[in-house]
Design a protein with these regions (language model features):
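Hydrophobic, lipid-facing positions within transmembrane beta-strands of outer-membrane proteins
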Residues: 4, 63, 89-93, 147-153, ...
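Extracytoplasmic beta-strand/coil segments of soluble accessory domains associated
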Residues: 1-24
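Outer-membrane beta-barrel pore domains and translocons
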Residues: 50, 68, 80-86, 98, ...
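Periplasmic-side early beta-strands and strand-to-turn transitions of outer-membrane beta-barrels
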Residues: 82, 101-186
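Outer-envelope beta-barrel architecture signal
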Residues: 16, 73-77, 89, 100-108, ...
Length: 253
């Protein structure tokens, strides 16, 4: 759930473009990113430094990262569960079912991530109410939960005379993130949080040797609805020990 900055050729931020199967990742909304894409759907990761292939259709100065999902032509089921430090849990499920007579394909995918992020902050300042002065100590982060859900369903046809594939896709992404600190660790929050939700509908098509040998037609279209909310209603000031006192303004103001 932490912010990240990936650098290629000394450039980062908007100088790098991210894609999933050649489609801009941003098409699924801001809540869908590298940190919450289900690992089990990834077949390989293509990294391009500097020059970006024409089929990606991007103009990134630093380069591009294209995540290629499982392209198997067989039925499969894949489920995984991972656990890590600071009460981190990750669950992924994806499958592919192909109807043998018609070639109609169904591809459901679900990913869930959760972490408390309650690691220890060392040498932070807290208010001692008895002495009415600040003291230094080590305290765990108490308001830094991260939770994300990604669900996608694809259906379409593969390996037809008229198409290598034609898929219609519907997806939903939800990210809930507590806000623990401000620009520095001296500013502590205990109630404010952010929510991001995205709904996406899309269609993608590809046909090699379209009308002529060596000519490939690739097309995609999508529409995304997105809602971002910052909740900041607590009129209090928090300290690293979890205690708080009343204030005349909200936390993020």
């Amino acid at each position: 759930g932490s912010d990240y900055n990936l650098t290629l050729n000394g450039m980062g931020g908007n100088s790098i473009r991210y894609y999933v199967d050649g489609i801009p990742m941003a098409a699924k909304g801001e809540s869908f990113s590298l940190e919450n894409i289900p690992a089990s759907i990834v077949d390989r990761v293509e990294v391009y430094k500097g020059v970006v292939p024409a089929y990606l259709g991007g103009d990134a100065l630093g380069g591009a990262i294209n995540i290629v999902t499982n392209e198997s032509k067989k039925n499969y089921y894949d489920i995984s569960y991972r656990v890590g430090s600071f009460n981190t849990h990750q669950v992924d499920f994806n499958a592919q079912i192909i109807e043998p007579k018609t070639g109609l394909t169904f591809k459901p995918s679900v990913g869930y991530n959760f972490s408390k992020n309650n690691y220890t902050m060392k040498g932070v300042r807290v208010l001692n109410p008895e002495k009415n002065e600040f003291e230094t100590g080590d305290f765990k982060r108490f308001h830094d939960d991260y939770r994300s859900v990604f669900a996608q369903f694809e259906t379409g046809f593969t390996n037809k005379l008229w198409a290598d594939f034609l898929y219609v896709t519907a997806s939903f992404t939800n990210v809930d993130k507590d806000i623990q600190t401000g620009a520095t660790q001296d500013v502590v929050y205990g109630a404010a949080h952010r929510k991001n939700r995205s709904w996406n509908l899309g269609i993608r098509y590809r046909k090699k040797n379209f009308l002529a040998e060596g000519l490939t037609l690739s097309a995609n279209a999508s529409h995304t609805w997105q809602k971002s909310t910052t909740v900041d209603t607590a009129m209090v000031i928090y300290f690293w020990n979890g205690h708080h006192r009343p204030a005349d303004y909200a936390e993020l103001n």
